[in-house]
Amino acid sequence: MGDSDDEYDRKRRDKFRGERSAGESYARGADRADRSRGRDEWAERGRPRQDYRDYRPPPRDRGYSPTREGPPMKRMRGDGWGDDARPRFGGHEPYGMYGGYNHDHFGMHPAGPYGHPGGLHPREQQSAGDMQTQPCMMTLKQFLATQDDSISDSEAIQKYNDYKLEFKRQQLNEFFVAHKDEEWFKMKYHPEESLKRKEEQFGFLKRRCDVFVELLDHGDISKVSVDTSNTDPLLRLLDTVVIKLEGGTDEDLKVLDEKPVEIVKILPEKPKVEVKKEPTLEDTIKKEKISIKEEKVEEADKPKEEKDDDKEKPAAEGEEPEGEKNDAEKEVTAEREDMDAEPAAKEPEPEEEPSRKKDRRKRSRSDSGSSSSSSSSSSSSDSEDEKEKEKEDKEEEEEKKETEEEAAPKSPKPVEEGEKEPQEEVENNGHKSGDEEEATKKDQAEPEKMDTDEAVVENNKESEEAEKEKDTSKDEEEANKESNEDKQESEKTETIDLVKDTTVGNSPRALHRTSSIFLRNLAPSITKAEVEAMCKRYNGFLRVAIADPLLERRWFRRGWVTFRRDVNIKEICWNLNNIRLRDCELGAIVNKDLSRRVRPVNGLTCHKTIVRSDIKLCAKIAHNLDDKVGLWKEQEDNGEKNGESFGLQSKNPVLQNITDYLIEEASAEEDELLGLSTEAAKKSNDGELVERDTQLIEVLDKLILYLRVVHSIDFYNHCEYPYEDEMPNRCGIIHARGPPPQNKVTSNEIQEYIRTFEGKMGSFLARAVDLEEEEMKKLGAKDAEAEVEKFIQANTQELAKDKWLCPLSGKKFKGPDFVRKHIFNKHNEKVDEVRKEVEYFNNYLKDTKRPQLPEHPGNTKKAPSDAAPPTAGYRPPYGMAHAYAPMYAPYAQPMMAPAGRARPGFGRGGREPMGEIRRPIIAYSDLDMPNFSDSFL
């Protein structure tokens, strides 16, 4: 029993050992191990009662349990719970709800890496952490804590307003200093760079306007309607504009009439051409069989012709063909072995034979079946062969007549070649060719008998060798031609997906088709000239477009590099991916072609009422944009300007006589007298079908195309396509009217559509208004002369009495006046830079839409009446800001928090705050007393 007790104690001591060994990593102290050791070693204590384990069934294997084998969950802490992260709960956070930005009060950028926020909870939105914001401004309570206690309320409010204004000035100045050296910022506000950019954009605009006027004079604009049913003419017009903008001529416009090459049908032809080059074994066997059958037919015809023509010939001469047959059979078998060893079959020349001859030979081959070379020697003895010979004799006679008629005006040589061509598949057939020559001589005239057969054989061999040499030369020429054709086809299939811009001669150029690469990452410090220098090394480079930076992307920019259509764009993209520009990965990818260039909008836009409203809106936008850039200003300088008169003062041909279509006409008096006004009101309530006015639509289409071509504004999409002249696809996308609805439309729906559309296009009607001088002074506008004076004082240093130093040159002078003169004379360019810097900063302040960091969420607290929490004007419990609480349950505002007592005047218009439950009034009164409950009502 002792052994069993020891074993039981060991098991009891090891009860939690497996779990603790896995959890030793979470700070298991030495004192805990010491406490457990004494209990394990106390084996002498008695156990009067059974242990609880005796009543349990035997344990089973639990397997892997991460909750048991790992440390407890209460010990796990997130990465963002360190000292640098914000507390999740509690009302003592200085920067409001969102934390982890590490902003200093006197710095624009966070203390950590550029653009990277502090610790964020994983469940918070990532966009909230990536956004750069201004540092949090002190609240009034925090500001008063820094002031003297004896300050009055009016002074405190005045000082706090001054603090807020100074804080805003500081943020604007810091943003300017941080971005003034970046190219995108210079193009907007620098006095020299911005002027160059404006001149460049005006040149693009002027060029577009000239192209539009040219197409308008030719009548191309009036032929096109902006409807999805008119997609092809609309795309042709846009492509015509692009070709004209690229400097194309009328000859280049013929490219638009060419049908696109079907790519799918051409690509599979490449393997078919390769199969034709190599003859298979079956083809060689078929050619051998055909040649053997032809030999058999001609040999069988020979004795018949000799019997019919020359019956008086001796028997010795009639036996010659049989001997020749045996020799030919031997030669055929020898040649077969050679052909098996070297399968180089020569193709026959079927072009010289007539089509009838081919058909008849095919029929004769099918009738004769598959006869072998072994049966050719005994063919004359078989009855079936005799029947076949009779049929073939008749066919041969007809063929000879036809060939004689064809070769009559020519020489008899082509006839011989035509007969010998099928025999050229087998080499060294001299005896048979000699027999054929004798037969032809017998048909034309009486032949002279030859003394010996050897002379005939030698002559025939010489003629055959000459013919073979000619045939081999012909075959080589044909093979060379086929190989050249295959090379050309392979070259075509290599660039089959590209439309080549052929500039040879006067051939039209596809200038509207380009290839492009999209650069996803361009650091703010990278300039356009650097990207152009990098891409100019590749052939076919055209232009570069770089977008404005985005705050959400840490002021990184995107770029598009345009090349000609015939370049290998994937190879260029691969090379650009291996380049780092200013230690920045460009992220180059191939930019796809536009999928849908004409996109539909609501078909309700073709209704007469909406069209008239759109004409008014289009005319206002066109006039406003023309006036903003001064497009038609040269022609308007003589007359007085009137901002509301579109066609009266403007020389724009699209806006002329536009007032005729802006005024509605109606027979109101007649309708009133006849009582038709009430009926019209009923019809408007019931709805009306979509009415299309062709004349109004033509006027509207000219305005829409003018905005799209000249100002890059897609009217029906209510948006502008910026820097389109530098993008890969100029005039790429346009939105057009879709099919009209079939159901009736009420007047309320029409008015709602017009009101919504005008609201979306309101940004194009707003005129650019600069800040007033007083407002600019409040924001810290600088004076040029004052800044120059500061610059001179900073560069005038007193070393000793009557000893002054100019740090710019290191020279010493006797007085400060001499240093001033020296700076103006020798360092005048530095003074000019100071003046330009002042103008640079003031231009930034003037812009009402200037870029800047967004305010911190803690700075934009709403009034209690606007964002009334359930606490009726008091601060939300647990320090949670009501307007910025994350939209997930564990960290949202507590719903069971106690509600505070409402104050008079708080809430929305004196009403009870949302979610507050009023406590019922409890009255204590004596039951013997009369009821005075009215006093509590």
UniProtKB/Swiss-Prot annotation:
GO cellular component, one term: nucleoplasm
UniProt keyword list: Nucleus, RNA-mediated gene silencing
Keyword hit for Ligase: no
Disordered as annotated region, ranges: 1-87, 109-128, 293-507, 847-874
Family that this chain belongs to: Belongs to the ARS2 family.
Function: Acts as a mediator between the cap-binding complex (CBC) and RNA-mediated gene silencing (RNAi). Involved in innate immunity via the short interfering RNAs (siRNAs) processing machinery by restricting the viral RNA production. Also involved microRNA (miRNA)-mediated silencing by contributing to the stability and delivery of primary miRNA transcripts to the primary miRNA processing complex.
Biased composition (Basic and acidic residues): 8-22, 29-63, 76-87, 293-316, 323-336, 343-356, 413-452, 459-473, 480-500
Cell compartment(s), UniProt: Nucleus
Annotated protein name in UniProt: Serrate RNA effector molecule homolog
InterPro entries: RBD_domain_sf, SE/Ars2, SERRATE/Ars2_C, SERRATE/Ars2_N
CDD domains (alphabetical): RRM_SF
Name of the gene: Ars2
UniProt GO molecular function: nucleic acid binding
Biological process, per Gene Ontology: primary miRNA processing
Disulfide bonds: none
Native species: Aedes aegypti (Yellowfever mosquito)
Source organism, top-level taxon: Eukaryota
Main location: nucleus
